[in-house]
Amino acid sequence: MSTNTQQSKSCPIPTRVLHLKDWSQLPDCYSQTPGGTLFSTTPGGTRIIYDRKFLLDCRNSPIARTPPCCLPQIPGVTIPSLHPVSKLQELKEELEEEKELAADDSQFEMDI
């Protein structure tokens, strides 16, 4: 064990009071403040505060604009679709024709 332990001094978290004039000014989400700051807690109880400016900076960062490396190969979502739009349209038309043919048959036909 180390006998040279140093205690760090804590500093207060800067806060401001915002007085609302109307109930409609309250945020929709419980983890959001009227000023736009988001906050959260970890399972251990640590408070995480995300300032609006920080979140906007993260959104505009180059890392946020690149896709994750381990995405699944989903045609039309993560990779270009394998079938052109015209082929998909042809398949839809064929399905509609089959439904129309099935609807023309009478359900209660009898041979006399």
Swiss-Prot record:
The modification Phosphotyrosine is found at Y30. Keywords: Phosphoprotein, Protein synthesis inhibitor, Translation regulation. Regulates eif4e1a activity by preventing its assembly into the eIF4F complex. This is Eukaryotic translation initiation factor 4E-binding protein 3-like. PANTHER family: EUKARYOTIC TRANSLATION INITIATION FACTOR 4E-BINDING PROTEIN (PTHR12669), EUKARYOTIC TRANSLATION INITIATION FACTOR 4E-BINDING PROTEIN 3 (PTHR12669:SF5). One of its GO terms (biological process) is regulation of muscle hypertrophy. Belongs to the eIF4E-binding protein family. GO terms for molecular function: eukaryotic initiation factor 4E binding. Interacts with eif4e1a. The keyword Phosphoprotein applies. GO terms for cellular component: cytoplasm. The modification Phosphothreonine is found at T42, T46. It comes from the Eukaryota.
